[in-house]
Regions:
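Positively charged, low-complexity intrinsically disordered leader regions
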Residues: 1-43
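Short, conserved acidic/polar surface loops in the N-terminal third of protein domains
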Residues: 86-91, 137-139
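A charged helix-plus-loop insertion that forms the helical arch/lid used to bind
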Residues: 89-105
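Divalent-metal (Mg2+/Mn2+/Ca2+)-assisted nucleotide/phosphate chemistry catalytic cores
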Residues: 100-221, 227
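Conserved nucleotide- and phosphate/pyrophosphate-binding catalytic cores
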Residues: 200, 208-387
Length: 387
């Protein structure tokens, strides 16, 4: 599974760390030292199956551990099938609703298939944290909890916000970072990879591993994919590109991405060289040709998730349900988030129906019509829904 030789090329290691990490604990220098030591490190990345899809944000960490695997290190993909039933409180202003065993099992059915689109299965092994967490006794849990104080937990921003707004905090929410932290102990980990929203949880694991095993775990905090709102890209904002999205849907979503995000996505979520990226957008500068950059970025993501043949397929009009007029049709197709925005595009002459610019909100649409937006999104009405 893992190569017999550990690659210790300092320049290559620095480039890997530069591209996708934001912070490293205990330090960048220590990480470089260990990666250049010639020793095989056991490094893991964990995903809780709280939903059925792995998305663009996950690929940052997956591409990072892929690079570490290619250096010869032992990579573990940890499926948090036990922790998913509790729910990570990170970033939540209310407690997560616990998931059932059945829901978690359903969510993770295609996880390995999705992950293998990014990192070949021969470069990592899989573990599930129910293997050790489900066997813990109440005595074990009390011992685990004794390593941290309530004060250490409630300093977290989300808990402070709930206290301020008089919203409840469940005791089980304090246990989540302890359980995630114990994963490192159970697997005797040398390093953990996660987004910066997971920093607290990963540092809990670092402290627990030091106390239980006397090991000083490396924590690789990756850069986060920030959406147009300035916050972490989220499903609720409709910005998430899932690895299971159809080729045309991936293209539609990429074409709607804010121009300011293009370089970041190319850096974090593809394996394209910096030379390729710089040719399209220099760091700190606007894209040279935003539309062309989006088209090429869409091609690359489709290629990564669905293969070369799907790239041509993604350029075809996406078949979708439409309405009886142009406004309701582009709204139903997901080209715009609201009726007002749909009307704006029509007023601007940014919508074509069958090759003709339409400036009438009430312009009738029918099955078979091809509608194109100024962003290059193209749909074919397969079925008319009259509401």
């Amino acid at each position: 599974m893992f190569g017999t030789k550990i690659i210790t090329d300092g320049k290559g290691i620095k480039e890997i760390l530069d591209r996708r990490t934001e912070t490293i604990y205990p330090s960048r220098q220590e990480a470089e030292k260990r990666l250049e030591s010639g020793n095989r490190l056991r490094i893991y990345y964990g995903i809780d199956p709280t939903g059925p899809d792995i998305h663009l944000g996950h690929t940052i960490q997956l591409l990072f551990i892929k690079e570490l695997a290619k250096l010869g290190h032992e990579i573990i993909l940890l499926i948090g099938d036990f922790t998913a039933r509790i729910g990570d409180p990170t970033g939540k202003d209310i407690a997560r609703k616990p998931l059932t065993v059945e829901q978690v099992s359903s969510n993770m059915k295609t996880y390995l298939e999705q992950v293998s689109k990014i990192i070949p299965e021969n470069l990592f092994k899989v573990q599930y944290n129910h293997s050790w967490l489900s066997k813990m006794t109440f005595e074990d849990v009390v011992k685990l909890a004794s390593h941290f104080t309530v004060q250490q937990m409630i300093v977290r921003d989300m808990f402070q916000e709930r206290i301020k707004n008089e919203k409840p905090i469940g005791i089980h929410e304090f246990l989540y970072p302890l359980m995630q932290g114990y994963d490192s102990v159970a697997m005797k980990i040398d390093g953990e990879v996660g987004g910066n929203d997971q920093t607290f949880n990963m540092l809990v694991g670092r402290e627990l591993e030091r106390e239980y095993l006397g090991k000083d775990k490396l924590v690789f905090v990756s850069r986060l994919l920030v959406g147009s709102s300035g916050k972490k890209m989220s499903k609720s904002e409709g910005e998430i590109i899932a690895l299971t999205d159809e080729p045309q849907e991936i293209r539609r979503k990429v074409l709607m991405i804010n121009d300011t995000m293009l370089r970041t996505i190319a850096e974090l979520c593809t394996e394209k060289s910096y030379k390729w990226i710089d040719e399209r957008q220099l760091e700190g500068q606007p894209p040279k040709n935003p539309r062309a950059f989006k088209e090429e970025l869409a091609d690359e993501l489709v290629r990564m998730y669905h293969g070369e043949k799907a790239v041509n397929e993604s350029h075809k009009p996406r078949k979708t349900s439409g309405g009886t007029n142009v406004v309701s049709s582009i709204l139903a197709a997901g080209i715009v988030p609201s009726v007002s925005r749909a009307k704006e595009l029509v007023n601007q002459g940014a919508i074509e129906v069958n090759g003709e610019v339409v400036k009438d909100w009430g312009f009738k649409t029918k099955k078979g019509d091809i509608i194109k937006s100024g962003k290059g999104i193209e749909i074919e009405i397969e079925k008319v829904i009259d509401k």
